[in-house]
């Protein structure tokens, strides 16, 4: 039969606008008065002004799990990563048949970064501040960006084994680099999610042009990583 693919917690337009404005950190736009809509639309105004509350009863009855149970959380996920108008977001998802413990252990071992990084970057791990990776560990690398030597230091945060961790650049070529790795059991395997928030140096001057080149490089790096994971047996 038919299934209503809608939110389990519907809201009215007024609340929708309020939550969206809050997430975007802007002032809410004043709603158009009902009388103005009736004058402009006539009888069609009833369609615009009337409320329809639809609930996803069938999928809820089948124990479907919603990623976001309310609109506020959904907006936070969409917009709260952005601290500056110069921040950029890159996201990638990939599924692998490997078990969660094996996948997490692989990605949380800094030595495997060399295998996951294109050779053109000449990426080398120089060491880390703790024997094992944990919250607060610093990892030191050297690499070449378009042939230019660079050094990079990452700080490990959000350390939740088998669930997630993030590496934050505290020294390197970007004004900001926050890479969050998420791991989730799915369909007998693991869904890998990468979320990268980055800010370019000199982003106020020619930022869009510079971002075109940098984003192309980021896509190349993650495409290479995707192909490596595809080859896992």
Language-model segments: residues:
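Beta-strand elements of well-folded, non-transmembrane domains
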Residues: 96-98, 143-147, 158, 185, ...
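Glycine-rich portal/gate segments that line the openings of hydrophobic small-molecule binding cavities
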Residues: 114, 124-173, 191, 224-232
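Hydrophobic ligand-binding cavity/cleft-lining segments
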Residues: 54, 58, 72, 76-130, ...
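Mid/C-terminal beta-alpha module of Rossmann-like enzyme folds, strongest
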Residues: 1-43
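Beta-strand/loop substructures that line and gate deep hydrophobic ligand-binding cavities in soluble
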Residues: 166-220
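Conserved C-terminal active-site "lid" loop/helix of NAD(P)H-dependent oxidoreductases
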Residues: 14-18, 40-65
